[in-house]
Amino acid sequence: SGLAGRYTAVMYVGSNYDEPLPRAFIEDVLTGDAKVLWSGFNIWQLAKNDDDRQAFVARFGWDPSTSYIDSLDKVSTVSYKSQELTRADDNTSGIIAPHVVDKDKVEVLAQANCKDQAGNAANCGSIAQTTGSQYPWAVRSSGLTYIGEIALTYINETDRYLAYADIVDGLLSRDGQAPSRKAAIRIEDVSPNTEVNDLKPLIDYLISEKVPFQIAAIPYYVDANGVYNNGQSLTKTFDQNPELLKLLKYAQRHGGTIVQHGTTHQYGKLNNPYNGVSADDFEFYRSWCTAQQNGGTPVECKTDTWVQLAGPVPSDSVNWAANRVSLGKSELKRVGLGKTKLFETPHYAASWNSYLGMKKAYSTRYERELFFPGMLNKDNAGNKGNFGLFYPYTVKNIYGTKVLPENLGNYEPESYNNHPPRSGADLVNNAKKNLVVTDGNASFFFHPDYPLSELKVAVKGIKELGYTFTPAT
């Protein structure tokens, strides 16, 4: 015992039901001074015998041995810092409801809201041991913070994950620290084939508003199978589109930062999953479409099919990815766009090897990312599943890379591949939900061929929430 005290804070994620705990760890939580954040299962292991139970209740004011998993009540929102955060209807997992026995010792940080099938407030079941339509979702007492579920699944931009992210960030001492309200915008998928008339209005508007911005530039435009070029393969560079290149350099002089967005944003002649064309396909991860959400036989991609992340591409290796990224970086420099410092992975998907390869060329990425089973014990699980995550603030990840957040999503007028449409007003609402995160950013992206009016709605609304647009650094 005593090991926990060597650290600023300790986090325990209870994913395996009834997993045994080392006695030394139990004693550290019950009697130590370290801050502890516990989420999910096995909190009852701290009160397994009478002595431990009495010690826990006396110190923390609630009883884990009589706190039960509520899987009967429908919880579709979580209240935190005066906002209702969403909880996906697909998430049918139960939530452990802390049984509070001494209210004076327990601070309720967030409440689970019980709803009926129509979405209206409903009295919670008796298993929650509460009165009314709420029970504690997160509690804090004497250095121990407990969250009744692992809020890392079924997440989206307005999810209760934001409360989790803020609580995690709060483990670090920040007494008296004012909330940080930074915003960022990225113009997406600008390739040598982009139309100047699509891009210029966005750039002119952002400059006029004195809004710093990023441009995600794809160094090489490739139509490997001639899908849009009469069956003839086509590769194009920025110096073959001189008016566009001139506009990009103008943007750089007026608050624009170039971000390398892959090298070709596609992979050879492979339909990955669509057509082998830049900006459409994945570059560093294999994908295909299926008719069902949970996989099945690959089918031709259509508007209503599901995109599946299938594993590493055939060329996958650390060196392959490093060389490919470096090729694109050199190309941007060759055409006069300077030495880029930020990288964005196409479609936010890469293998473990590819992420490590990217690190050889860039120390900072600006995106969301994937994680894989076995990472903590250094066992590369290859294509045995993946886990996507976004952040509401800047982090340094397990790959050793600094990651700048994109956490609001993008404007999208229509549903595509079962992703819902998202308006400029939706982006503003997402930014509003992110206000619960003390150090939260409001970062989104926007494609050049979409209406300027929607960009204006997003920028204006995010400013009115109190955010300040800054360069992504």
Question: Which residues are covered by each model-predicted region?
Answer:
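C-terminal domain-boundary segment and adjacent tail
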Residues: 163-179, 197, 201, 208-219, ...
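Catalytic grooves of carbohydrate-active enzymes
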Residues: 183-191, 196, 319-322, 326-342, ...
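A glycine-rich, often tryptophan-bearing local segment used as a flexible ligand/cofactor-contacting loop or short
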Residues: 12, 16-89
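Aromatic-Pro/Gly-enriched surface loop or interdomain linker
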Residues: 1-8, 179, 206, 215
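Acidic (Asp/Glu)-rich catalytic clusters
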Residues: 32, 175, 202-210, 237-263, ...
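Metal-dependent polysaccharide deacetylase catalytic core of the NodB/CE4 family, i.e.
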Residues: 44-46, 50-52, 212, 216-353, ...
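Non-catalytic propeptide/linker segments at domain boundaries
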Residues: 116, 122-182
